Each structure stands twice: as structure tokens, then as C-alpha cells.
């Protein structure tokens, strides 16, 4: 027995467990200011072996590689399609200083849902880590929403909703990061609608559970 399918399941379970731990940590630390160290710990927790697949990566720190950080669609017969190129690694610390300051000072100054949407987009635009940016970005959303609602309880699963709508998510993210006029209104509208869908889905699940107990 080679156990290949079982190995794959173990890896999948380990990835899911690591992601859930980070999301849980974001919720339960929502009463504290966001810090670079917090995000370093989140990202390191996602890659406990220091590898992403077969590749060794920098963990617990922002990226430092000289190569451009690009979001691409690989193609076998043609050049890769570059959807977005993030700031150079040497500029990441500066961009993240601004981001962290904004995140910690914008609470109560902006609508909570809008703030969560902007936080996710801004973070993904910087793409500060070698890997794990999407999951860290979702953890920031969980933290922002918990701060706005003043609760550490997960009332809905936004990560699951984004995963279900991932095609639309990547399309909206690409559109938002490529707008020359920096108009992020369509992104915010889409993101808020995604939160509403997640809330509706959670409500339906609770209603179904209550009916099954009657």
C-alpha cells in the first residue's frame, strides 16, 4: 500500500488545521492592536516546515527576494499571464508600516464592513509574504469584523464563502488592483455582498439545525 491518497488527505487536513488556527488567533487577539510580529507568527504557523510544497520559503518575516512578486496564470505553450505585480521586496516594510498604522487608527472612523474590505484589498495589494498572503488577508478580515462587532465569536464563515465564490473573488481582486483611478467602490460592494451571503448561509444552517431538533 503506497498510501498516496491518504498522504494527500493528511496534507490537506494539516493545511486546513493551520488555517483555522490562524483565523481563531485573529479573532481572539482582536482586542489587541495589529502588529508586524502578529502577522509574522500567523504566516509562520501556516508553514511549520518552512516549505510551501517542495519549495523552501521565508517564514515569520516579510519577503526579501529580488525577483518581482507577480500574480500570474501559468501557461504551457505561451508566456504566463501577469495579472498584478506587487511592490518590490525592498519597499514592503515601508508599505506595511503605513498599512499597520491605518489598521490600528481607522477603527470607529470607518464603517466596519468597508474597513474590512479595504484592509483585505490593501494587504493583498502589498502581498508582503512569500506565500500565505490570501489566508493572512482573510485573517485580517476576521480581526477587523471582530473589532467592529466587539465579539470574538465567529458568527459566519467568510473564508468558506470566499472559497465558494473564488472565481469571482480573484476576478474582483484583479480588477481592483488594476484600476488606474484607484476606484475601489466595486470591490467594496462585492466584498460586502459576500459578507451578507456568509451571514445568510450561517442563519440558514442555524435554522436547519433548530428544525432538526424539534
What are these regions (language model features)?
Residues 1-214:
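FIC/Doc superfamily catalytic core
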